Amino acid sequence: MPELPEVETVKRGLAPSMEGRRLTRLELRRTDLRFPLPVDFAARTQGRLIVSLSRRAKYLLIDLDDGVSIVSHLGMSGSYRIEAANETGLPGQFHMARSRDEKHDHVIFHLSGPEGDPLRVIYNDPRRFGFMDMVERRHMDRHAAFAGLGPEPVGNALDADYLAFRFKGKAQPLKTALLDQKVIAGLGNIYVCEALWRAHLSPETPARALVNAEGKPVAALEDLTQAIRTVIAEAIEAGGSSLRDHIQADGSLGYFQHSFNVYDREGEACRTPGCTGTVERMTQAGRSTFHCPQCQR
């Protein structure tokens, strides 16, 4: 399932083509994805100006000029592509001429620019695990998808003092604690595995072990915080990771998977300089964890 870097990549790919354009028609080719589409979805969005594209955690937000945002979650296989009648006039660099299977084109945004030039943004989702909803931005924190979300692993909100506050007294394994979206929003399985490897921490370490008696972060928690921020920044720069069905808005694939140090590398040599260990896989809370038991302690 796409994590924060993948959704950020899609947002950046779509923004040049969608921002500042008017939504002349929302074409719905079915009434539901994972959940039913909003009541009067097409009617409520017709004629609205798209003022910006944004992101919260793993959700893409299409912000309209009436204070409402369209919430889009990509699920397991959701992707967007952009089509213009005049390809040479396509804004931005993101374009994919054809979907992999157009029978899975479920939602089509018909847009017009300042000069009336038409453009279509098409949501394709073979498995239909994604969903779309609408939310008033002023009440976004009340929406089920956003209520209680923690800070994101980008910007200045995430620091070691915050994690020490959340981890104090918590016996939960470190990896499980980091996957809690109420602790850090948008952080998923891939990047938790990678950050723990960079910080040389075992995914089974109790979260409370990184907090001292005074409730302050130990040095290892400082290292982990920096590792999280770094791995997310590098993944965004690389365009996310192309696992299973993730695809960027231009039809190309992300390439951070070529930088994986532990994720999906079971049985391969650890890449920590001087370490002779081998990457192993185990299951935690129903998810695969990849780690090096020799240098992650």
Curated annotation (Swiss-Prot):
DNA binds at residues 104, 127, 170. It catalyses: Hydrolysis of DNA containing ring-opened 7-methylguanine residues, releasing 2,6-diamino-4-hydroxy-5-(N-methyl)formamidopyrimidine; 2'-deoxyribonucleotide-(2'-deoxyribose 5'-phosphate)-2'-deoxyribonucleotide-DNA = a 3'-end 2'-deoxyribonucleotide-(2,3-dehydro-2,3-deoxyribose 5'-phosphate)-DNA + a 5'-end 5'-phospho-2'-deoxyribonucleoside-DNA + H(+). A zinc finger (FPG-type) spans 261-297. PROSITE patterns: FPG_CAT, ZF_FPG_2. CDD domains: EcFpg-like_N (cd08966). Keywords: DNA damage, DNA repair, DNA-binding, Glycosidase, Hydrolase, Lyase, Metal-binding, Multifunctional enzyme, Zinc, Zinc-finger. Binds 1 zinc ion per subunit. Pfam families: Fapy_DNA_glyco (PF01149), H2TH (PF06831). Its cofactor is Zn(2+). GO terms for molecular function: 8-oxo-7,8-dihydroguanine DNA N-glycosylase activity; class I DNA-(apurinic or apyrimidinic site) endonuclease activity; damaged DNA binding; zinc ion binding. Involved in base excision repair of DNA damaged by oxidation or by mutagenic agents. Acts as a DNA glycosylase that recognizes and removes damaged bases. Has a preference for oxidized purines, such as 7,8-dihydro-8-oxoguanine (8-oxoG). Has AP (apurinic/apyrimidinic) lyase activity and introduces nicks in the DNA strand. Cleaves the DNA backbone by beta-delta elimination to generate a single-strand break at the site of the removed base with both 3'- and 5'-phosphates. Monomer. This is Formamidopyrimidine-DNA glycosylase. The gene is mutM.
